[in-house]
């Protein structure tokens, strides 16, 4: 991000680790690989473990935010081509629908994807630039479809309206140039941050991202949670920069887990 407004705002915080105060929002991760170890078959023990994690968060005075995907692909999904295959998006959406039904009575706030841009540009073993854009396009499409699916599922079950968004990893522009935008990670800052943000928040797919599911423009996120490591000054800078790109509410991710 090149520029950010100078105005300081109070930014809602979302904790990926243990929150220091009661009433804070905390991410509860739902590990897809454990919840659906075989295609179409749920693992009852894993489902119960996530349910218990949500209940513990509530009992401790927290507000649980269920994260549906943080990079843990089931082996069977990877064997089918993973995020490179458009037809596989239905597998992810089937899992999302099941999660919304299983856990919807315990939370009304969701994160669809945790740092999808980081997963594609820094953690993916695939070094082909075109295939990386394909993965990111499919994840953005899956996010939008997941938002609609969760909203519809909750409406059918007469549950409270949901708030659903995604977590995006962001860096000041100088950090991107020094680290990410070199060698095998030769993407532009726009490709890393701006393209996924616009596609997932607004359904605005700019080239080279492809709108493979013909997503209509609209409001496809109630919030965007910005993560940026442990440097508070840089993280706040990125939050303000993200706010210049969309009218969507911006949250700040506080992550005190071990360095990932």
Q: Model-predicted segments: where are they?
A:
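Conserved nucleotide-binding/hydrolysis modules and their immediate coupling elements
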Residues: 246
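Non-catalytic scaffold segments within catalytic domains of secreted glycoside hydrolases
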Residues: 1-23, 34-223, 227-232, 236-240, ...
């Amino acid at each position: 991000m090149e520029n950010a407004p100078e105005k300081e705002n109070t930014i809602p915080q979302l904790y990926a680790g243990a929150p220091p105060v009661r009433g804070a929002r905390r991410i509860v991760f739902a590990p897809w690989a454990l919840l659906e170890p075989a295609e179409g078959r749920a693992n009852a023990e894993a489902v119960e473990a996530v349910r218990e994690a949500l209940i513990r968060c509530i009992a401790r005075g927290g507000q649980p935010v269920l994260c549906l995907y943080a990079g843990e692909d089931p082996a069977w999904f990877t064997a089918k081509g993973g995020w490179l295959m458009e037809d596989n998006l239905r597998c992810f959406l089937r899992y999302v629908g099941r999660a919304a039904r299983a856990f919807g009575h315990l939370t009304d706030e969701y994160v669809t994807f945790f740092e999808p841009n980081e997963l594609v540009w820094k953690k993916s073993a695939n070094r082909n630039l075109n295939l990386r854009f394909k993965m990111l396009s499919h994840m953005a499409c899956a996010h939008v479809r997941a938002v609609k699916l969760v909203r519809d599922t909750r409406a059918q079950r007469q549950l409270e309206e949901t708030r659903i968004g995604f977590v995006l990893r962001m860096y000041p522009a100088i950090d991107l140039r020094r680290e990410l935008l070199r060698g095998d990670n030769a993407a532009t800052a726009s490709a890393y941050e701006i393209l996924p943000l616009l596609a997932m928040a607004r359904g605005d797919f700019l080239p080279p991202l492809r709108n493979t599911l013909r997503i209509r423009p609209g409001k496809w996120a109630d919030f965007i949670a910005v993560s940026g490591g442990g440097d508070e000054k840089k993280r706040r800078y990125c939050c303000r920069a993200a706010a210049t790109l969309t009218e969507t509410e911006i949250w700040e991710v506080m992550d005190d887990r071990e360095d990932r």
